[in-house]
A protein has these predicted regions:
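Glycine-/small-residue-enriched transmembrane alpha-helix faces in small-molecule transporters
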Residues: 1-33, 131-162, 183-185, 209, ...
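Specific transmembrane alpha-helical segments of multi-pass solute transporters/efflux pumps
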Residues: 11, 15-16, 51-90, 94, ...
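Transmembrane alpha-helices of multi-pass small-molecule transport proteins
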Residues: 27-73, 100-104, 151-159, 173-194, ...
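Specific alpha-helical transmembrane segments that line the substrate/conduction pathway
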Residues: 33-36, 40, 79-111, 234-253
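C-terminal-most transmembrane helix of multi-pass membrane proteins
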Residues: 35, 39, 242-283
């Protein structure tokens, strides 16, 4: 399970970097179109992974909300947050996902669960104490908009983990991705910006490689989540959704696309300690 998780984390980081680069350098970029293309690749790779067929009695409304909370809203809101202020606000909000899942499911906050969440929340606090976006030319509305987008991501993923079926999870996730593809298809109204289309046609091999790698990474993450639901508490599984923003921030710093702050070491260390200490087994 560690290898697919590593592939998923690196794949997500690569996708985040490329998508952010497109948004910064091409104002005509459609984030809906880019996410739709990636989800198509994810859908194809997920159907390669075998899963048991099951007779679902879920309503169409349940399927719509399942795909909306699991893929459509988190992807778009996370991208908007990063586009406005960078990755640090998004990173600071990640510990709220397992915390809210705990509160929603009625799990007891004690022992290592409480200690782990405290360390993760200290990581969040360290981001806001140092305000590491001060060197960016940001306006106040951008920070507030990023806060709203990050809140949407956290609340939607919390709802998704709460309603996530614990049996035959991969089957439901496959159909959830399919629902997200249909939703984004209607939202973007089959719109491909001319600049992005020209760039894609000029370097089709590069774009195909990026989309494929991103699709494999996300498919691996979905497989890890579906496999872990039967062996881990659902709040512990939610931690898997918290990894790729941290990986992307670290990769941006390494590639010198973002300004390195010594406080980043404190933040990442506290988050890592919290998630390592967090109890994983479903006892």
């Amino acid at each position: 399970m560690l290898l697919p998780l590593l592939v998923a984390t690196v794949g997500h980081a690569a996708w985040d970097n490329v998508l952010h680069w497109m948004i910064v350098n091409d104002p005509d970029t459609s984030i809906f179109h880019m996410h739709w293309l990636r989800m198509v690749i994810v859908y194809l790779f997920m159907w390669i992974i075998p899963s048991k067929k099951t007779k679902s009695t879920r309503s169409l409304w349940w399927w719509f909300t399942f795909s909306l909370y699991g893929w459509t809203l988190p992807a778009i809101s996370y991208t908007v947050c990063v586009m406005l202020t960078g990755y640090r606000i998004a990173v600071s909000f990640q510990p709220f996902i397992p915390l809210l899942v705990v509160l929603q499911t009625g799990a007891v906050l004690e022992g290592y669960r409480l200690v782990g969440l405290n360390f993760a929340m200290l990581g969040t606090l360290s981001v806001w104490v140092w305000s590491p976006w001060y060197h960016k030319d940001l306006e106040l509305w951008q920070i507030w908009a990023a806060l709203f987008a990050a809140t949407v991501q956290v609340l939607s993923l919390t709802k998704w983990f709460v309603i996530l079926p614990r049996e035959n999870t991969l089957y439901y996730m496959k159909h959830g991705v399919g629902g997200a593809i249909l939703t984004l298809f209607f939202v973007m109204i089959i719109w491909a910006p001319e600049n992005m289309s020209a760039d894609f046609l000029a370097k089709p091999d590069k774009w195909l490689l990026v989309l494929t790698f991103a699709g494999i990474g996300t498919a691996c993450k979905n497989w890890v989540i579906s496999s872990a639901t039967s062996r881990m508490t659902i709040d512990a599984v939610a931690i898997f959704e918290c990894l790729h923003p941290v990986a992307t921030l670290c990769s941006d710093i390494i590639l010198q696309k973002d300004v390195f702050e010594y406080e980043d070491i404190v933040t990442v260390t506290l988050l890592a300690i919290g998630w390592i200490l967090y109890p994983k087994r479903n006892i």
